[in-house]
Each structure stands twice: as C-alpha cells, then as structure tokens.
UniProtKB/Swiss-Prot annotation:
Its EC number is 6.3.5.7. One of its GO terms (biological process) is translation. Heterotrimer of A, B and C subunits. It comes from the Bacteria. The lineage of its organism: Bacteria, Pseudomonadati, Pseudomonadota, Alphaproteobacteria, Rhodobacterales. Allows the formation of correctly charged Gln-tRNA(Gln) through the transamidation of misacylated Glu-tRNA(Gln) in organisms which lack glutaminyl-tRNA synthetase. The reaction takes place in the presence of glutamine and ATP through an activated gamma-phospho-Glu-tRNA(Gln). It comes from Cereibacter sphaeroides (strain KD131 / KCTC 12085). This is Glutamyl-tRNA(Gln) amidotransferase subunit A.
Length: 491
C-alpha cells in the first residue's frame, strides 16, 4: 500500500509511531497528483507550500502536535487561501489571490494539516456535475466502459481526489447536496454539518443561509477527525454558533441499540430505480440488525423542497454575486472608446460568469423583483419553514436519525445532461436539499455498487447539533456495509 492510500486515522498512527514522515506522506500524494492529471481534480497544486508545511509538521512531532499534524489535504477552490489562487472555478476571479486565510483553512493549518493545493468544483458551487467549472470537467475515477463519468458537484474535484487517493481527505461545501451527492457518486464519505457549526468566513458565498463547509473523507472515522478540526465558533461569522465542539471521534462507539431511525415515506419517489430502493431496504436491515428501531415517518412538505430551494438559492446568489463588477478585483472587461461604467459592469459580468451562473443570477433577480417578491421568494421562505417544521416534529416524536437514499442514481456520463432541460440536472438534489433548507446535519455513506459496478450511497440525517450521534449511526452503517471497493486505476 502506498502512503497516499492511507486514511487519516492510519496515517496519524504511523506518523506518531515514527513509521512514516510527513514529508514522505506528502511526497506520495504529490506523486499521485501528478499521475492523476487526467482526473482534473487539482487545479492549483501547491507543492512548495505542502513540503514546507510537512517539514514543519515533522519538526513539531510529539506533545505539541495538532490533531492533523502532517496530514495532506486538498482544499476546494471556494475557500480563500492566502497568496494562493482562489477563484471559485470562475473566470471572473481569474488571478485573484486573497490577502487572508479562511477560518476553516486557518483551523486546519493550526491543527498541523498540509495543503496540497486547490480542487476543481462547479463555478461558484452552482452545479451537480462539475461541468460548469472554468477549469474544465473534473472526472470520476470510477469508470464504466470507456465513458468519462461525473464525480458529482459542486465539490467534484474534492470527491475525485479523495476517491483516487490523491490526498487523504478534502474540504467541501454543501448548499443543496454539494458534499453528499459527489461523495455518493465516488464511493466516499461526506458530511454536511448543522448550519452554523463550521465558519463560513473566507468561503466565497453562493447562498448564505444554506452554505455549509464539511469534510470529504475515506471513512466515517476520518470525517469525525476532520470535522473536529474544522468546527467551532467564529466571531467573524455572524451565523456561527457559539456551541462547544464535542469529541466526534470518541462518539464512534458503534452502539445504536434502542435508537429510532425514521424512514420518510415521501422519499419513495416515482420512477426511483429498483437498485436504489433495494439499497435503502438493505440499509434499514443493517441498522435494525445493530439494534435500532426502524419507524415510518412522514415529511409531508418534501415535494415542495426542490422548487423552494431553486427560488431561495438563486435569490441569495444574485445578491452575493452583485459584488463581482470588475472594479476592485478579478476580471475586468476591455472597454471600447466611449464605454461608461454600466458598459464595464455588463461586459465584465457577461465575460466572467458562465452560463449556469448567469441563469441563476437572472432567476434570482427575477424572484426578488418588486412584482414577484411575494409570489415567489416569500412563498419559498414559508415552504422552507414548513419543511423545517416537518423535521422538528419527527425529532420531537423521538426519532434519532433519518435514513434516505443519497442520490436518485449512480454517477452519469459527462456531457449526458448537456442538452437536457436544466431541471433534469436540478433533480439530482432531490434527496439532499431538504437538509440544507432545514439547516440539519446530513452524511452520505457508501453502501454498495449498482449493476454497472458504480458506487451508491445512503444518507443519514441527524438532529440539529448532533453530528456526534449522526457520525455514530454512519459508523454502524459503514461497518455493516463493509464497502471497501476502490476504482480500478485507468489514469
């Protein structure tokens, strides 16, 4: 086994025992990144920074070493990293190098982590297939025939990099499923924490009331370790919760006897593939075998989640993206003689934003406009409150976690949705958006393969602030499923 194939927990133990140095571990990952160029997962590799941090980690070994000392990670391009290109996969931020570090990356570096570079993603996190990126598509390391498959989105580069062992783990962000859907498509673990658990400061904003950063890892234990380092109150983020961060790893007892697992009847969608239905049934059996009580629940407003999400998210995006005007940073269009300031704004935004981002900004501006604010935006906010109430009532009735499919299918081919109605792509988020609208924690766990040999995941949804309990349920599911398959190396 090469060092880059280790989990965080395994590498941590090997580093502590002196069986492995952080420099050797980092070099193994950098070699894998070079070989993994066809995956287009890393878009800004930072080998010099990585090796400097690895040498510092080796020098620090011992008592004062942090929880992630010497662990090489990939960072989604949405996180601002000081002096390193951070452009949210958009041409409008081409050449932008922040003067500051995001809170999440600061915390990771304080814990001793090594940054291997920045990862591909959908432009401004708007997409479910990593096809809206200015860097080109990220490619799923899993393959069927000779088709190039999507790794999912928007955290597609993060998912591909972890699944292909280019790094030990990666950061992602999740606005409507952008950690959980790519994790399911690539056979890895991805957790979206409770809204406010992880600081959003220094993360390029898409939809401020929905965005949440989280870890993408090779195991549930790794997710617990990485989340522990990322989470915590941040006075720089007004939505960050001042709540103590428990020891997530210590919560992985594997004991869920007597816990109630809710199965929402509304998630049985018309036309859902039989494989997904069978996987969900298997997940129920695994949790029941571990001593959990399986109960049917109702989340009656589920069917309104996608339309509500695709009003609220674009509305917030159109407001957040108004700042990209070519004045202070990023791309500025070349102006003709006699062009004024309005021409500069229009040309800059037309050249800098990709088609999907333009579409969502237009939708968002429309639903916030005077004549339509009540008809669309306010109605969507009311629906959101009802969706949250559905979950609150389920948890108040004693449910500890909710089990659902993570995605409506396995990974699809790159370019397959290119000519489809955009709504067909939006349907990828059908099982995940409710969790963001309600601000709850959700985790995707790989449980099996479909008939084509592609990974499928199940989603567990937890009570607010109970990531510890959620991770423990996921740990039980992971152990019972025994998913150890890896993509066959073709790159």
């Amino acid at each position: 086994m090469n060092a880059n194939e280790l989990t965080i927990a395994e590498a941590r133990d090997a580093l502590a025992k002196g069986e492995l140095s952080a420099v050797d571990l980092t070099m193994a990952c950098l070699t894998a990144i070079d070989a993994g160029t066809p995956l287009n997962a890393f878009v800004h590799a930072t080998p010099e920074i990585a090796l400097d941090q690895a040498r510092a980690a080796d020098a620090r070994r011992g008592a004062e070493a942090g929880a992630l000392n010497g662990i090489p990670l990939g960072i989604k391009d949405l996180f601002c990293t000081r002096g390193v290109a951070s452009q949210a996969a958009s041409n409008i931020l081409r050449g932008f190098k922040p003067e500051y570090e995001s809170t999440v990356t600061s915390k990771l570096f304080e814990a001793g982590a090594v940054m291997l570079g920045k990862l591909n993603m959908d432009e401004f996190a708007m997409g479910s297939s990593n096809e809206t990126s200015c860097y080109g598509d990220a490619v799923n390391p899993w393959k069927v025939d000779d088709r190039r498959l999507t790794p999912g989105g928007s955290s597609g580069g993060s998912a591909a990099a972890v699944a292909a062992d280019l790094c030990l783990a990666a950061t992602g962000t999740d606005t409507g499923g952008s950690i959980r859907q790519p994790a399911a498509f690539t056979g890895i673990v991805g957790i979206k924490p409770t809204y406010g658990r992880v600081s959003r400061w220094g993360i390029v904003a898409f939809a401020s009331s929905l965005d949440q950063a989280g870890p993408m890892t090779k195991s549930v234990r790794d997710a617990a370790i990485l989340l522990g380092a990322m989470a915590g109150h941040d006075p720089k983020d007004s939505t960050s919760a001042d709540i103590p961060v428990p020891d997530f790893e210590a919560a992985l007892t594997g004991d869920i006897r007597g816990r109630k697992i809710g199965i929402p009847r509304e998630y049985r969608m018309e036309g859902m593939p039989a494989e997904i239905e069978a996987l969900w049934a298997r997940g129920r059996e695994m949790l029941a075998d571990a001593g959990a009580e399986i109960v049917d629940i109702s989340l009656p407003h589920t069917k309104y989640a996608l339309p509500a999400y695709y009003v609220i998210a674009p509305a917030e995006a159109s407001s957040n993206l108004a700042r990209y005007d070519g004045v202070r940073y990023g791309h500025r269009a070349r102006l003709g003689q006699g062009d004024g300031i309005v021409d500069m704004y229009e040309k800059t935004r037309a050249e800098g934003f990709g088609k999907e981002v333009q579409r969502r900004v237009m939708i968002g501006t429309y639903v916030l406009s005077a004549g339509f604010y009540d008809a669309y935006y306010n109605r969507a906010r009311k629906v959101r409150a009802l969706i949250k109430r559905d979950f609150d009532e389920a948890f108040a009735a004693g449910v500890d976690a909710i089990l659902t499919p993570a995605t409506p299918s396995s990974a699809f081919g790159l370019g397959e949705m290119a000519d489809a109605d955009p709504v067909a792509m939006y349907l990828n988020d059908v099982f995940t958006v409710t969790v963001n609208l309600a601000g709850l924690p959700g985790i995707s766990v790989p449980v099996g393969l479909d008939a084509k040999g592609l990974p499928l995941g199940l989603q567990l949804i937890g009570r607010p602030w109970d990531e510890a309990g959620l991770l423990n349920h996921a740990h039980v599911l992971e152990r019972a499923a025994g998913f150890v398959e890896k993509p066959r190396k073709w790159w």
